[in-house]
Each structure stands twice: as structure tokens, then as C-alpha cells.
Amino acid sequence: MAYLNAIYYTDNGPSHGPGFPPVIFIHGFFMDSRMFKKQIHYLQDKYRIICMDIRGFGRSHCAKSKFTLYDIADDIIKLADHLKLTKFVICGMSMGGYIALRACLRYRERVCGLILIGSQAERDNEETVQNYYFLSKSWGDINIRNNIIEQLLPIIIGKNERDQDSWRVTWGSYDNEIIKNAMHAMLTRDEIIQQIKHITIPVLVIHGEQDLGIPVEAAIKLRAN
């Protein structure tokens, strides 16, 4: 575990795997790199696995100003340069998938594969946008915050109470600035549905049929493009 320019990351597995490219994991909104601990444990004997906490989440320092998903894509490349990774796969979950797609579009010569988990290429519909803005504006009210957390836990984490307890504490610690700036980056993202048609590298799309956050139809449309 280490830091690069206030961005926390972990680096596990062989530095020079048997012909396999390194994989950089990018977590979703509200989450941090700990969400991939089981994947790290399973894959690290064969693959080099790098996980980073995006700006403001996990152990990365809080972003004091607004940023875009492309800024996080730039963070990925800076980390890859620091680790001397010429080519690599990016695995992104939900918002992490939004970032992975944009990193691929901006740095085509560096990204050799994508894994998109519970993600989509299109922007959110108006109802979802308004719900997110309500979350952002209401986060300073502790009662509303706690109510939002309890609603989101089964949607994002599932029914495991031990996992819920861990993330409940983490989410409750996020201040307004973290939520506001990350939410701004996610909700103001550009439309890339036409651009992704030009992605030629291998892409693995993984999506749960009962995903409540992003419907599986979004993954079907992503795969079709």
C-alpha cells in the first residue's frame, strides 16, 4: 500500500506475470478499493492487481475542488507511469466503469482491455439525476443522511449484515465536500455512446440480472455498441 500525489493504491501479485497484463481496479461511487479484497485474494497469485481509491474516497485525500471523470482517468495514467506499466487492463465497477471507458478513449495506446461491472455507457436519466442531486444537497442533515444510507446498503452491498455494518460506518464518515465533488463528476459526465463504437480492444461486460442501481438493459445496450 502506498500513495501517489494523495491517491492511495495497493499493488499485489507478481511484478512480471506469465504473459498476463496488469489489471487496475477502479471502485464505484461511495465505495473504495476494499470492495475488491476478495478479487485480489483470488487473482494475485497469477496476476498483478493494482487497486486505487479515487479522489476523496477511501484513503485518498479529499478533493477540495470540482473534478471530472477524465481527471480520474489522468490519475490512473499517472499511477501507471509511476509503476512503469506500459499497457494494462482496467476493471471498473459502476462509476469505475464510467472512468474506465473514458480512460480507454483518451489513452487508447495504453489500455489493452476493459472489464465493466454493473456499469453503462449512457448518462443517467432525469429521475436518477434528480435523486442524486437530492442526496448531494441533503447529505449535511444527519437524519436524512442515515436514512439514505439505510436505503442504499441493500441496493449496493446486498443482504450480508457484516458487510453492511462496515460500509455503514464508512459512508457515514463522508462529508459534504466529498459527496458534492464526486457527484458533480458523475452527473456532468459527457455522452460517449457514439465514441465507444470505436473501441477495438477486448471488453468483458459483467452485470447482475437483479441489479437495482443500473438495470441489466444498460449492459445489454453497452455490449451491443
Where are these regions (language model features)?
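Conserved alpha/beta-hydrolase catalytic His-Asp/Glu region
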Residues: 124-130, 143-197
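Conserved alpha/beta-hydrolase "acid-adjacent" motif
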Residues: 212-218
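Residue in the alpha/beta-hydrolase core beta-strand immediately N-terminal to the catalytic nucleophile
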Residues: 53, 89, 112-115, 197
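Flexible "cap/lid" loop of the alpha/beta hydrolase fold
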Residues: 98-106, 110-142
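Conserved alpha/beta-hydrolase "nucleophile elbow" surrounding the catalytic nucleophile
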Residues: 27-29, 88, 92-97, 208
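Conserved HGGG/HGGXW glycine-rich cap/lid loop of the alpha/beta-hydrolase fold
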Residues: 8-65, 79
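Short beta-strand/loop motif that positions the catalytic acidic residue
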Residues: 199, 205-207, 211
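Conserved acidic catalytic loop of the alpha/beta-hydrolase fold
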Residues: 70-88
